[in-house]
């Protein structure tokens, strides 16, 4: 019988937890025996998820002030362009999936209204696009990108329910090839974008269960997925319950018609929650309303006063009016200063949405008024980018793999006369 997929024993799992530096400082509220019991008799090998998680962790845990910055991708092709341009990770936000990439096929606000497996579906699509780009590059002998399969950090939102929902969603993320996932401490049924009003927190202990469940799913899958805890306590004014004594200093005593308790928002509850989440999370993210380095510094110092090695994440959000808050020189050094504070993963959540919408609007605006010159201007800018910066998608047939599949065709039949690129307008006109 084959040994492929043989599950780890409880002893092997425990030894990994005890000796692997990857797990320094990580708490699990379950045992190695329980993980072994949940594995089944065959454990699938999640190559992309495991490889991506290792790359991501090595990058964010490296000593020094270096950081990884990423843009939110909405499509597979956007992710390919990001990697081609030099980025080392891809971010996938639930907001963008809600807005234009969910399995319901509708446009939604960021309120967890779409099918729960939509984000894993887009993770898979992005990985498929990156795999194809890698295959094309290998056939062409193109070594300009050293790693096409960069880590993907994906949005688990508030988990779409309780601990079991989180477990299943995390499994789906891993199967799709996500390297990291983040989970926010909002009530799933009332979940809102971090920059909307009406956010309702769950008790601290309940979110620890969320993080614990996400970690358990990764352990059962034998994948070192990077688990990121997000707190929305900086702006949230409601909480479901006063059951957790750690939350009580911030509860005002007033209640709403729905039975929720009012809480005091701000930095202090964020730090308190982050300290509670730290043993269960690889990284921590405080959602904020403005690009405020002083606030970020106070948060980092507050958390690291108790957990000095805690890694942090930061949302460089498009919901901020950056130029209204900061001068150009401050914007230029913003991420570098965050990196020095320990914010080792920084991302622009909705970059894909804004790039896609403005790019098409700008082209359509010109085309509606000028006709063909508007598109030709775009094409000429593509040619220039190809010549000066390594942009390749101006050759659109090549970009989607026509040459790669020609290689397959001629491998099967060396005398094939039906290859696609030979004799194409692209071959003749796009040199």
Curated annotation (Swiss-Prot):
Residues reported in the UniProt entry to bind Mg(2+): 155
PROSITE patterns the record matches: ISOCITRATE_LYASE (PS00161)
Superkingdom of the source species: Bacteria
Keyword Heme: no
Alphabetic keyword roster: Glyoxylate bypass, Lyase, Magnesium, Metal-binding, Tricarboxylic acid cycle
Subunit structure: Homotetramer.
Protein name: Isocitrate lyase
Source organism: Corynebacterium efficiens (strain DSM 44549 / YS-314 / AJ 12310 / JCM 11189 / NBRC 100395)
């Amino acid at each position: 019988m084959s040994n492929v997929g043989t599950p780890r024993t409880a002893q092997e799992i425990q030894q990994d937890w005890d000796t692997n530096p990857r797990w320094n400082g990580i708490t699990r509220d379950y045992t190695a025996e329980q993980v072994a019991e949940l594995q089944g008799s065959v454990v699938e090998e999640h190559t992309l998820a495991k490889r991506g998680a290792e790359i991501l962790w090595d990058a964010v845990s490296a000593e020094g002030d270096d950081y990884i910055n990423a843009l939110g991708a909405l499509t597979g092709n956007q992710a390919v362009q990001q990697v081609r341009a030099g980025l080392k990770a891809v971010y996938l936000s639930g907001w963008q999936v809600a807005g234009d990439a969910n399995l319901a096929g509708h446009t939604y606000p960021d309120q967890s209204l779409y099918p729960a497996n939509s984000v894993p579906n887009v993770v898979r699509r992005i990985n498929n696009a990156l795999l194809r780009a890698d295959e094309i590059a290998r056939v062409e002998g193109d070594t300009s990108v050293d790693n096409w399969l960069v880590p993907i950090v994906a949005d688990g939102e508030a988990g779409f329910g309780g601990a079991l929902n989180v477990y299943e969603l995390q499994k789906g993320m891993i199967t799709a090839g996500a390297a990291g996932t983040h989970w926010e401490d909002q009530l799933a049924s009332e979940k809102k974008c971090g920059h909307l009003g009406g956010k309702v927190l769950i008790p601290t202990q309940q979110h620890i269960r969320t993080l614990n469940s996400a970690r358990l799913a990764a352990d059962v899958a034998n994948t070192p997925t990077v688990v990121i805890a997000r707190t929305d306590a900086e702006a949230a004014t409601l909480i479901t319950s006063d059951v957790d004594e750690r939350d009580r200093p911030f509860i005002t005593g007033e209640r709403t018609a729905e039975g929720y308790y009012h809480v005091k928002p701000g930095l202090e509850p964020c730090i308190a929650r982050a300290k509670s989440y730290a043993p269960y999370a690889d990284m921590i993210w405080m959602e904020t309303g403005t690009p405020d380095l002083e606030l970020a510094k106070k948060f980092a110092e507050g958390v690291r006063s108790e957990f000095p090695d805690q890694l942090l994440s930061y949302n460089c959000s498009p919901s901020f009016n950056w130029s209204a808050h900061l001068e150009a020189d401050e914007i230029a050094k913003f991420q570098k200063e965050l990196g020095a504070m320990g914010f080792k993963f920084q991302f622009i959540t909705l970059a894909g949405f804004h790039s896609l919408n403005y790019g098409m609007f700008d082209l359509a605006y010109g085309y509606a008024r000028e006709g063909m010159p508007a598109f030709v201007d775009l094409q000429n800018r593509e040619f220039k980018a190809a010549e000066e910066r390594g942009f390749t998608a101006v050759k659109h047939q090549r970009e989607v793999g026509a040459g790669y599949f020609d290689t397959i065709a001629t491998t099967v039949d060396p005398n094939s006369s039906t290859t696609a690129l030979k004799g194409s307008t692209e071959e003749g006109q796009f040199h």
